[in-house]
Amino acid sequence: MTARTPQALLFDLGGVLVDIDFGRAISAWAPYSSLSSAELRKSFTYDFQYERHERGEIEAAEYFDHLAKTLQLDATHEQIEHGWTAIFVGEIRQTRVLVEAMRGILPCYAFTNTNATHMAAWSRLFPGVVGAFDKIFTSHELGLRKPERAAFDRICHLTETPASSIVFFDDLPENVQAAKKAGLQAVLVRSPDDVATSLRPLVRQLRKASGETTRRAHWEGRSG
């Protein structure tokens, strides 16, 4: 960590607190497509429409129509949505426990690239994750998504926290690099151990800062 004492923690959700697998969506859509499973996997991309959907610029119905055309799906919106929400594998409990522990020390926020349909699903499936945070910021509600610089600037504004005083945890290198360019402290998460390892020195740093503040107040009181 950098020398700046953290004032808030910011976590990604997918890949950090919730395990996701888009292969599950491909498997669910396969019976409705004229493409092979391999062709489906190749055809599904995080394309322009995907990003627009995550910014809330288009509704689910328009995005599902795009998927139906791109993946050659002869399926209803309900059937496409069933596959779309099948990506959530489970909660990464070890990280959630760490967030809950840190919340007693610092404000804990989440910022996730998502959409209204996925948000409804993970909010229902993982209430413990949702409840672990002071606030969850979502790309489709902000109209901004990672790794856009404006997205990080907006989070700093909404939390009233200087960028250099936020520690950000994400599983994608491009998001971590973008956060650093925006001035945040950032950690690449490949496993819950990366979160735990990064938090240990952070807690020591906070305790040291707290101790120095206490000692300063003590001596100022004596001198007064």
Per-region residue spans from a language model:
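Asp-based, Mg2+/Mn2+-dependent phosphohydrolase catalytic module
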Residues: M1-Q7, F11, N115-A116, A120-G224
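N-terminal helical cap/lid subdomain that shapes the substrate entry/recognition surface
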Residues: T2-V97, G104, N115-M119, P201
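Generic structural signal for small/hydrophobic residues in well-ordered secondary structure
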Residues: D12-G15, G56, M102, A110, ...
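Structured helix-beta-strand junction loops
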Residues: G104-I105, A132
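Proline-centered loop/turn at the N-terminus of a beta-strand
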Residues: P107-Y109, Q185
